[in-house]
Amino acid sequence: MPNYFFIQSQDPYTDRVTDDQFLLMSQLAGEGKEVSLFLTQNGVVPAAFQAESPMFDKLLDQKIKIYADKFSLEQREIAETELKRNIESAEIHVVVQAMLAGDKVIWN
């Protein structure tokens, strides 16, 4: 069974495609597939505690590993302590590791 590794660089407030991506992640996780999500660039915006994004927030209750790019957080002045639950700050090497492990990598 393949693992899925999504890279989200867009925020759900300016790019409606992100909700479709979040729905796909939710469906795959619901089917028992291993799903990870790496938020980068503007994709880190819904990870902030005060941000409202219903489709993104649903992912927090599923078995999905969610990472937020440290550099992108710093650029947007989002402290690691301001992240929503179940989100881990990480560096780009997690993407490289997923690729080397043979995960199906999907970038938006």
Located regions from the model:
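Short, glycine-rich nucleotide/cofactor-binding loops
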Residues: 4-19, 41-48
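A glycine-rich helix N-cap at a beta->alpha junction
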Residues: 52-79
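Histidine-anchored nucleotide/phosphate-binding helix
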Residues: 17-32
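Anion (oxyanion) recognition and catalysis
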Residues: 29, 60, 99-100
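Short beta-alpha junction loops
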Residues: 40-44, 70-73
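Residues at the starts of beta-strands that form the adenosine-phosphate
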Residues: 3, 30-36, 65
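Charged helix-capping and loop-helix junction motifs
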Residues: 19-23, 50-55
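C-terminal structural segments of small proteins and small subunits
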Residues: 76-108
